Design a protein with these regions (language model features):
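Residues at beta-strand starts and edge strands
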Residues: 69, 95-99
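A short, surface-exposed beta-strand/turn
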Residues: 86-96, 122-123
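C-terminal partner/receptor-binding element of secreted or periplasmic proteins
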Residues: 104-134
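Bacterial N-terminal signal peptides
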Residues: 9-16
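A mature extracytoplasmic/lumenal domain signature
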Residues: 66, 75-78, 90-91, 101-107, ...
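Bacterial N-terminal signal peptides that target proteins for export
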Residues: 1-9
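N-terminal secretory signal peptides
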Residues: 22-81
Length: 134
């Protein structure tokens, strides 16, 4: 099961740049749910952690924490959602893949809502692919 979850993390990373839109407005939290008070704090902490692999893909900073089955995506300065951090944790239960997502977006509400919608769609496509194949 651990190997499949790691494969899912790699798979999520491969889809990070083919985002699409959905209609539902995202729910908002009153405080950060990513474990850090700010996007900058999260990025600095993850970059300092030797167990986490950090790479830049198409301007996005991607931090992969295989031990905790977590993939972080940080928007580039060129993106309307900058600065933002998307934290996704992959779980497998009863042969079903689940993605738990938390977002901290410090940009405008419309840009943040759009970012969340894009990642929700991405997560849905990834889950469908992992359940049913390409």
């Amino acid at each position: 099961m651990k190997q499949r979850a790691l494969t899912v993390i790699a798979f999520i990373g491969s889809f990070a740049w083919s985002l699409a839109f959905s209609q539902a407005p995202p729910q908002e939290a009153k405080q950060s749910t990513i474990g850090y008070a700010s996007v900058a704090e999260a990025l600095v902490a993850l970059q300092a952690n030797r167990k986490i692999q950090v790479a830049v893909q198409n301007g996005w900073t991607i931090a992969t924490d295989q031990e905790n089955k977590t993939l972080w995506s940080f928007s580039p300065k060129s993106d309307p959602s900058y600065p933002s951090a998307v934290k996704r944790i992959v779980e497998e239960r009863n042969d079903t893949v689940f993605v738990h997502m938390d977002v901290l977006c410090e940009a405008s509400k419309p840009a943040c809502d759009n970012l969340v919608r894009q990642f929700q769609q991405l997560n849905e496509r990834m889950q469908q692919h992992m359940q049913h194949g390409p």
